[in-house]
Swiss-Prot record:
PROSITE patterns for this protein: SHSP
Family: Belongs to the small heat shock protein (HSP20) family.
Name of the gene encoding the protein in the UniProt record: hspG3
Sequence segments annotated as region (Disordered): 119-164
Gene3D superfamilies (alphabetical): 2.60.40.790
Lineage of producing organism: Eukaryota, Amoebozoa, Evosea, Eumycetozoa, Dictyostelia
PANTHER family noted in UniProt: HEAT SHOCK PROTEIN DDB_G0288861-RELATED
Domain of life per record: Eukaryota
SUPFAM superfamilies, A to Z: beta-sandwich domain of Sec23/24, HSP20-like chaperones
Domain sHSP: start-end pairs: 31-227
Protein name in UniProt: Small heat shock protein hspG3
Annotated keywords: Stress response
Entry keyword Repressor: no
Amino acid sequence: MTTLFDILNTLNNNNNNNNNYAGCKRQHSINKRVDIIPSMDVTLTNDKLIIETELTGVSKNDIDINIKDSILIIQGEKKKSIIKHQQQQQHQQQQQQQQQQQQQQQQQQQQQQQQQQQQQQQLENSNKENDEPSIEEFEEDVKSKSELNKTTLNTTENKDEDKTTQNISKKFISERSFGNFKRYLNLSEILYQLDLNSINTQFENGLLTITIKKKFDSSNTIKININ
Protein backbone atom coordinates (compact mmCIF):
# COMPACT_ATOMS: atom_id res chain seq x y z
CA MET A 1 0.00 0.00 0.00
CA THR A 2 1.43 3.35 -1.05
CA THR A 3 1.67 6.16 1.47
CA LEU A 4 1.79 9.93 1.08
CA PHE A 5 5.55 9.78 1.67
CA ASP A 6 5.99 7.33 -1.23
CA ILE A 7 3.91 9.47 -3.57
CA LEU A 8 5.88 12.60 -2.71
CA ASN A 9 9.16 10.74 -3.27
CA THR A 10 8.04 9.56 -6.70
CA LEU A 11 6.85 13.08 -7.49
CA ASN A 12 10.23 14.53 -6.56
CA ASN A 13 12.19 11.90 -8.51
CA ASN A 14 10.00 12.22 -11.59
CA ASN A 15 10.21 15.98 -11.39
CA ASN A 16 14.03 15.92 -11.30
CA ASN A 17 14.21 13.47 -14.18
CA ASN A 18 11.68 15.43 -16.16
CA ASN A 19 13.54 18.68 -15.56
CA ASN A 20 16.71 17.10 -16.93
CA TYR A 21 14.84 15.77 -19.92
CA ALA A 22 13.05 19.07 -20.49
CA GLY A 23 16.34 20.94 -20.28
CA CYS A 24 17.57 19.04 -23.33
CA LYS A 25 14.25 19.28 -25.08
CA ARG A 26 13.69 23.01 -24.75
CA GLN A 27 16.94 23.79 -26.56
CA HIS A 28 15.30 22.44 -29.70
CA SER A 29 11.70 23.52 -29.14
CA ILE A 30 12.12 27.00 -27.67
CA ASN A 31 14.38 29.74 -28.98
CA LYS A 32 14.41 31.61 -25.67
CA ARG A 33 17.19 30.68 -23.25
CA VAL A 34 16.19 29.69 -19.71
CA ASP A 35 18.08 31.96 -17.31
CA ILE A 36 16.28 31.43 -13.98
CA ILE A 37 15.21 28.27 -12.11
CA PRO A 38 12.66 29.39 -9.47
CA SER A 39 12.39 27.50 -6.17
CA MET A 40 9.35 25.26 -5.68
CA ASP A 41 7.64 23.57 -2.71
CA VAL A 42 5.11 20.75 -3.26
CA THR A 43 2.83 19.70 -0.39
CA LEU A 44 0.29 16.88 -0.54
CA THR A 45 -2.38 16.90 2.18
CA ASN A 46 -5.41 14.71 2.79
CA ASP A 47 -7.65 16.84 0.60
CA LYS A 48 -5.45 18.86 -1.80
CA LEU A 49 -2.13 19.36 -3.56
CA ILE A 50 -0.34 22.67 -2.93
CA ILE A 51 2.43 23.92 -5.26
CA GLU A 52 4.29 27.06 -4.19
CA THR A 53 6.78 28.74 -6.54
CA GLU A 54 8.93 31.78 -5.75
CA LEU A 55 8.67 34.35 -8.55
CA THR A 56 9.92 37.53 -6.91
CA GLY A 57 10.02 40.52 -9.25
CA VAL A 58 7.87 38.81 -11.91
CA SER A 59 4.68 40.42 -13.18
CA LYS A 60 1.47 38.38 -13.10
CA ASN A 61 0.98 39.06 -16.81
CA ASP A 62 4.33 37.40 -17.62
CA ILE A 63 3.46 34.00 -16.06
CA ASP A 64 2.02 31.10 -18.07
CA ILE A 65 0.65 27.94 -16.38
CA ASN A 66 -0.65 24.84 -18.16
CA ILE A 67 -0.92 21.06 -17.81
CA LYS A 68 0.09 18.92 -20.76
CA ASP A 69 0.48 15.12 -20.80
CA SER A 70 0.22 14.90 -16.97
CA ILE A 71 2.98 17.52 -16.58
CA LEU A 72 2.41 20.88 -14.90
CA ILE A 73 4.43 23.61 -16.65
CA ILE A 74 5.13 27.00 -15.07
CA GLN A 75 6.99 29.37 -17.38
CA GLY A 76 7.46 33.06 -17.95
CA GLU A 77 9.92 35.91 -17.95
CA LYS A 78 11.39 38.21 -15.33
CA LYS A 79 11.81 41.54 -17.07
CA LYS A 80 13.70 44.70 -16.26
CA SER A 81 10.46 46.59 -16.73
CA ILE A 82 10.80 48.91 -13.71
CA ILE A 83 14.37 49.92 -14.52
CA LYS A 84 13.59 50.34 -18.20
CA HIS A 85 10.54 52.45 -17.39
CA GLN A 86 12.59 54.75 -15.17
CA GLN A 87 15.32 55.03 -17.78
CA GLN A 88 12.77 55.79 -20.48
CA GLN A 89 11.20 58.51 -18.33
CA GLN A 90 14.60 60.07 -17.65
CA HIS A 91 15.50 59.88 -21.34
CA GLN A 92 12.19 61.50 -22.32
CA GLN A 93 12.70 64.29 -19.79
CA GLN A 94 16.21 64.91 -21.09
CA GLN A 95 14.93 64.99 -24.66
CA GLN A 96 12.18 67.45 -23.72
CA GLN A 97 14.69 69.70 -21.96
CA GLN A 98 17.00 69.57 -24.96
CA GLN A 99 14.14 70.39 -27.33
CA GLN A 100 13.11 73.35 -25.17
CA GLN A 101 16.70 74.61 -25.07
CA GLN A 102 17.03 74.22 -28.83
CA GLN A 103 13.75 76.07 -29.41
CA GLN A 104 14.88 78.92 -27.16
CA GLN A 105 18.23 79.09 -28.92
CA GLN A 106 16.55 79.09 -32.32
CA GLN A 107 14.24 81.90 -31.24
CA GLN A 108 17.20 83.91 -29.98
CA GLN A 109 19.09 83.32 -33.21
CA GLN A 110 16.06 84.34 -35.27
CA GLN A 111 15.68 87.53 -33.25
CA GLN A 112 19.36 88.32 -33.65
CA GLN A 113 19.20 87.62 -37.37
CA GLN A 114 16.22 89.94 -37.69
CA GLN A 115 18.11 92.62 -35.78
CA GLN A 116 21.12 92.12 -38.04
CA GLN A 117 18.98 92.38 -41.13
CA GLN A 118 17.43 95.58 -39.86
CA GLN A 119 20.85 96.96 -39.02
CA GLN A 120 22.19 96.01 -42.43
CA GLN A 121 19.27 97.70 -44.12
CA GLN A 122 19.89 100.78 -42.05
CA LEU A 123 23.57 100.64 -42.97
CA GLU A 124 22.78 100.24 -46.65
CA ASN A 125 20.37 103.13 -46.53
CA SER A 126 22.89 105.26 -44.70
CA ASN A 127 25.63 104.20 -47.11
CA LYS A 128 23.54 105.36 -49.97
CA GLU A 129 23.28 108.73 -48.37
CA ASN A 130 26.84 108.72 -47.05
CA ASP A 131 29.54 106.56 -48.56
CA GLU A 132 31.29 106.06 -45.23
CA PRO A 133 29.43 104.44 -42.32
CA SER A 134 29.11 106.29 -39.06
CA ILE A 135 31.02 105.23 -35.93
CA GLU A 136 27.83 104.29 -34.06
CA GLU A 137 26.68 101.94 -36.82
CA PHE A 138 30.08 100.30 -36.97
CA GLU A 139 30.04 99.70 -33.19
CA GLU A 140 26.54 98.20 -33.35
CA ASP A 141 27.62 95.84 -36.12
CA VAL A 142 30.61 94.67 -34.07
CA LYS A 143 28.39 94.14 -31.01
CA SER A 144 25.87 92.05 -32.96
CA LYS A 145 28.63 89.83 -34.37
CA SER A 146 30.15 89.31 -30.92
CA GLU A 147 26.73 88.39 -29.50
CA LEU A 148 26.28 85.82 -32.26
CA ASN A 149 29.65 84.28 -31.47
CA LYS A 150 28.70 84.07 -27.77
CA THR A 151 25.42 82.29 -28.53
CA THR A 152 27.15 79.71 -30.74
CA LEU A 153 29.68 79.08 -27.98
CA ASN A 154 26.87 78.69 -25.43
CA THR A 155 25.03 76.19 -27.65
CA THR A 156 28.14 74.03 -28.06
CA GLU A 157 28.77 74.19 -24.29
CA ASN A 158 25.18 73.17 -23.57
CA LYS A 159 25.48 70.22 -25.95
CA ASP A 160 28.67 69.09 -24.25
CA GLU A 161 26.97 69.38 -20.84
CA ASP A 162 24.01 67.31 -22.07
CA LYS A 163 26.36 64.56 -23.27
CA THR A 164 28.13 64.46 -19.92
CA THR A 165 24.88 64.38 -17.90
CA GLN A 166 23.53 61.50 -19.96
CA ASN A 167 26.47 59.25 -19.05
CA ILE A 168 26.51 59.93 -15.29
CA SER A 169 24.63 56.76 -14.16
CA LYS A 170 26.90 53.79 -13.39
CA LYS A 171 26.03 50.39 -11.93
CA PHE A 172 28.48 49.39 -9.18
CA ILE A 173 26.84 46.10 -8.10
CA SER A 174 24.74 43.83 -10.34
CA GLU A 175 23.55 40.69 -8.53
CA ARG A 176 19.91 40.41 -9.65
CA SER A 177 19.05 37.90 -12.36
CA PHE A 178 16.60 38.51 -15.19
CA GLY A 179 15.38 36.39 -18.07
CA ASN A 180 13.17 33.41 -18.87
CA PHE A 181 12.22 30.62 -16.47
CA LYS A 182 10.51 27.26 -16.80
CA ARG A 183 9.63 24.57 -14.22
CA TYR A 184 8.11 21.15 -14.77
CA LEU A 185 6.20 18.99 -12.27
CA ASN A 186 5.25 15.46 -13.26
CA LEU A 187 1.78 14.65 -11.88
CA SER A 188 1.34 11.25 -13.54
CA GLU A 189 1.57 9.33 -10.22
CA ILE A 190 -1.27 11.21 -8.53
CA LEU A 191 -3.21 12.70 -11.44
CA TYR A 192 -6.06 10.21 -10.94
CA GLN A 193 -6.54 11.61 -7.41
CA LEU A 194 -6.81 15.26 -8.48
CA ASP A 195 -9.86 17.22 -9.53
CA LEU A 196 -8.48 19.42 -12.33
CA ASN A 197 -11.68 21.47 -12.40
CA SER A 198 -10.88 22.75 -8.90
CA ILE A 199 -7.50 24.34 -9.74
CA ASN A 200 -7.04 27.63 -7.91
CA THR A 201 -4.10 30.02 -8.38
CA GLN A 202 -2.99 32.93 -6.22
CA PHE A 203 -0.06 35.30 -6.79
CA GLU A 204 0.86 37.54 -3.86
CA ASN A 205 4.16 39.10 -2.73
CA GLY A 206 6.11 37.22 -5.40
CA LEU A 207 4.76 33.78 -4.37
CA LEU A 208 2.70 31.76 -6.85
CA THR A 209 0.42 29.25 -5.10
CA ILE A 210 -1.43 26.59 -7.11
CA THR A 211 -3.99 24.51 -5.21
CA ILE A 212 -5.64 21.40 -6.69
CA LYS A 213 -8.28 19.61 -4.65
CA LYS A 214 -8.49 15.84 -4.46
CA LYS A 215 -11.44 13.87 -5.75
CA PHE A 216 -13.85 12.36 -3.25
CA ASP A 217 -13.38 8.93 -4.80
CA SER A 218 -9.64 8.81 -5.56
CA SER A 219 -9.33 5.11 -6.29
CA ASN A 220 -7.54 4.28 -9.53
CA THR A 221 -9.75 1.29 -10.29
CA ILE A 222 -12.74 1.60 -12.59
CA LYS A 223 -15.70 -0.76 -12.25
CA ILE A 224 -16.80 -2.17 -15.61
CA ASN A 225 -20.22 -3.76 -15.86
CA ILE A 226 -20.92 -6.68 -18.19
CA ASN A 227 -23.92 -6.25 -20.45
